[in-house]
């Protein structure tokens, strides 16, 4: 399904549904952390300790923070006699570099999901392995 087609349904997800989605991603991400670390070490030559202790946890941190932010976020606000409603903007195009690959992916994907946006992700062609594992995580 294309991101544009998926946006019609996903943009209507309730706040609670998006929180549950982020919780599920966090849980699966945690289980797959060793695999993600191995992918980062393979694709960019980072020492496994750096991949395990910094690279992979930084990506997880973005999802944890997006969930916390979403839990307390108000999508509607009254200003004087007006009601301001914040809605998903549409499909996001995400391009990520080779360095800190999982961090760069997560810092873009997590808030897009929290906002109700779908996306097309173009990971680095130099370091695509962690993106492949990450995309598998999203197949909940």
Regions found by a protein language model. Give the residues of each.
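Rossmann-like NAD(P) dinucleotide-binding subdomain of oxidoreductase/dehydrogenase enzymes
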Residues: 75-140
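N-terminal Rossmann-like NAD(P)+-binding subdomain of aldehyde/semialdehyde dehydrogenases
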Residues: 1-80
């Amino acid at each position: 399904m294309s991101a544009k087609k998926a946006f019609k349904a996903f943009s209507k997800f309730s706040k609670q549904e998006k929180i549950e989605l982020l919780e599920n991603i966090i849980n699966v991400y945690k289980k797959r952390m060793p695999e993600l670390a191995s992918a980062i070490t393979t694709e960019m030559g980072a020492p496994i300790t750096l991949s395990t202790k910094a690279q992979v946890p930084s990506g997880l941190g973005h999802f944890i923070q997006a969930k916390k932010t979403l839990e307390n976020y108000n999508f509607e606000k009254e200003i004087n006699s007006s009601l301001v409603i914040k809605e998903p903007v549409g499909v996001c195009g995400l391009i990520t570099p080779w360095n800190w690959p999982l961090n760069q992916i997560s810092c873009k994907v997590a808030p897009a999901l929290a906002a109700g946006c779908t996306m097309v992700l173009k990971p680095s062609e130099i370091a695509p392995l962690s993106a492949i594992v990450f995309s598998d995580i999203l197949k909940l």
